Curated annotation (Swiss-Prot):
GO terms for biological process: division septum assembly; DNA damage response; meiotic cell cycle; microtubule cytoskeleton organization; mitotic cytokinesis checkpoint signaling; negative regulation of G2/M transition of mitotic cell cycle; positive regulation of cytokinesis; positive regulation of exit from mitosis. This is Tyrosine-protein phosphatase CDC14 homolog. Belongs to the protein-tyrosine phosphatase family. Non-receptor class CDC14 subfamily. It comes from Schizosaccharomyces pombe (strain 972 / ATCC 24843). The active site is at C286. Changing C286A: Inactivates phosphatase activity. Its EC number is 3.1.3.48. Phosphorylated by cds1, chk1, pmk1, and cdc2 upon Hydroxylurea and H(2)O(2) stress treatment. Phosphorylation regulates the nucleolar-to-nucleoplasmic transition. Is able to autodephosphorylate.
Length: 537
């Protein structure tokens, strides 16, 4: 349904054909709009300003607003009439902001809307809604918005520190008055209140026999509601023994009026708060219970419940109007990250303590190197285990073998086959003559491969054919009368062919024993098959 052209100005829709908001320069005439029910709170729910502040409206106003809306809905339901409910306000920017804020907060706390949906209808309003200022006398340089109020209440509800069903409107409106103590609940943990004044009291004089009525009301209420700690932030205006005599602890944490506390004082306040038992209540006051009180309570709510600075300022002002004044707003905004960091710092410290408690420190052994298998034998006398095969070792004077020369499983099998084939060849061909091979030069020691146990070795020998074929006889045996180098070859003792040159002698000296390939029984050596004349490991 479009009401834009009905002379009602801009109609902001929250629920189609059910709930709307608009601002009008004059009250509408009901007979012109029979399908709508108009109501306003401008003259019914009134904000009581300190100076130039005008809102937001407090939590008792919110509850009363919900009662009004539900009363209208119930009336139409009983009459079986379907009318759109329209909240309207004056075009005054302050009244307009209060009405729109109250409706959005109602949608979140009562109708359980998520904050972004409650704010969406107000986002395109023209002109935009005015921000809320502090209660100070100076020129305002810091504002909170309807969005801050909505998210502040939402976060308080999500953190279980606000349940409007548990708020007694009568008590709220009674005790917020100066003559009745001037205090408000901020959360189930905190009460903010103005300093009690004990007329005629000072440090040197005796305690007055009778307390002023506001002080007596505060004292009785605190005892009945499990207040365990009083934190005084201003200079003394009463005797602290008044609280101590009824079992309430009293703590002085003074700093100047209108200023902000040191971060060390904030940490002390947080630590002090967490020392109070879970169901114990802490009452905090300065002179008026607004500025300095709001600093410390706001810092704790940011620390504990993840409020942003704007959210916590807005929330506290809804619970107790006027809280946090002037530069204290900027202080909360600047230091909000430090409050959260302190939370994680303490959480980490607790986690470390729990881990340490779970694994208590043990006395170290008298001999740290003793075996840990339950015996008293020292590791010094315990034999070392066998070295793992294949561990790298350095040998002086030799270069380490290249990676391609390391034995693999296939090369080990090949070497074993070669060994068996050589033995079989010696037995079957022991009558063949070895006449024309050169001195069977054996490669350097680094080409020797060791497999199996350390006592069993297999020597892999490279055999080369002669580059000259002129000395090969028809039967395939090379003539023993000459060497491939051209030097005369002679038969030496020990069944070795050697040349007369010094090179041949040195080669013979370098060669390893070929007992695995020789059979000296007949003075002959086995001749390998030509296809296996070059073996590469």
């Amino acid at each position: 349904m479009d009401y834009q052209d009905d002379g009602l100005g801009e109609m902001i829709e929250f629920l189609e054909d059910k709930l709307y908001y608009t601002s009008l320069s004059q009250p509408p005439k009901a007979e012109l709009y029979p399908h709508m029910h108009f109501f306003t709170i401008d003259d019914e729910l009134i904000y009581n300003p300190f100076y130039h502040d005008f809102g937001p409206l407090n939590v008792s106003h919110l509850i009363r607003f919900a009662v009004i809306v539900h009363g209208i809905m119930g009336k139409h339901r009983q009459a079986k009439k379907s009318k759109a409910i329209v909240l309207y306000s004056s075009t005054d920017t302050r009244l307009r902001a209060n009405a729109a804020c109250l409706l959005a907060c109602y949608m979140v706390l009562v109708q359980n809307w998520p904050p972004h949906l409650a704010l969406a209808p107000l986002a395109q309003a023209e002109p935009p809604f005015l921000g809320f200022r502090d209660a100070g006398y100076a020129v305002s340089d810091y504002y909170i918005t309807i969005q801050d109020c909505v998210y502040g209440l939402w976060r308080a509800r999500e953190s279980s520190i606000l349940n409007i069903r548990n708020i007694d409107v009568h008590d709220y409106e009674t005790y917020e008055r100066v003559e009745n103590g001037d205090f408000n609940w901020i959360s189930p943990k905190f009460i903010a209140f103005a300093s009690p004044i004990q007329a005629g009291w000072n440090h040197a004089s005796t305690r007055p026999k009778k307390l002023p009525q506001p002080f007596a009301i505060v004292l009785d209420y605190f005892v009945a509601n499990k207040v365990k700690l009083i934190v005084r932030l201003n200079g003394p205006l009463y005797d602290k023994k008044t609280f101590e005599n009824v079992g309430i602890r009293h703590k002085e944490m003074y700093f100047e009026d209108g200023t902000v506390p040191e971060l060390s004082l904030v940490k002390e306040f947080i630590d002090l708060t967490e020392e109070v038992e879970e169901d114990g209540v802490i009452a905090v006051h300065c002179k008026a219970g607004l500025g300095r009180t709001g600093c410390l309570i706001g810092a704790y709510l940011i620390y504990k419940h993840c409020f942003t600075a704007n959210e916590v300022i807005a929330y506290m002002r809804i619970m107790r109007p006027g809280m946090v004044v002037g530069p204290q707003q900027h202080w909360l905004h600047i230091n909000q990250v430090h409050f959260r960091a302190y939370f994680y710092e303490k959480a980490m410290g607790r986690a470390i303590q729990q881990a340490t408690a779970a694994e208590p420190l043990a006395t170290p052994p008298r001999h740290p190197l003793n075996a840990t298998n339950g015996t008293s034998q020292s590791n010094i006398s315990t034999p070392l285990p066998e070295p793992t095969p294949g561990q790298p070792r350095k040998v002086s004077g030799h270069n380490p073998p290249s990676a391609r020369r390391l034995p693999s499983a296939s090369s080990v099998k090949f070497n074993e086959k070669l060994k068996n084939a050589s033995k079989q060849s010696i037995q079957n061909e022991n009558k063949a003559s070895y006449s024309s091979y050169e001195d069977s030069e054996i490669q350097n020691d680094d080409e020797t491969r060791t497999v199996g146990t350390p006592t069993e070795t297999i020597s892999v020998v490279r055999l080369r054919r002669s580059s000259s074929q002129s000395n090969i006889e028809p039967n395939g045996v090379r003539s023993p009368t000459s060497s491939p180098t051209g030097s005369p070859i002679r038969r030496t003792s020990g069944n070795r062919w050697s040349s007369g040159s010094s090179h041949s002698k040195k080669s013979a000296q370098r060669s390893v024993s070929m007992s695995s390939l020789n059979n000296t029984s007949n003075g002959r050596v086995a001749k390998p098959k030509p296809s296996k004349s070059r073996l590469i490991s």
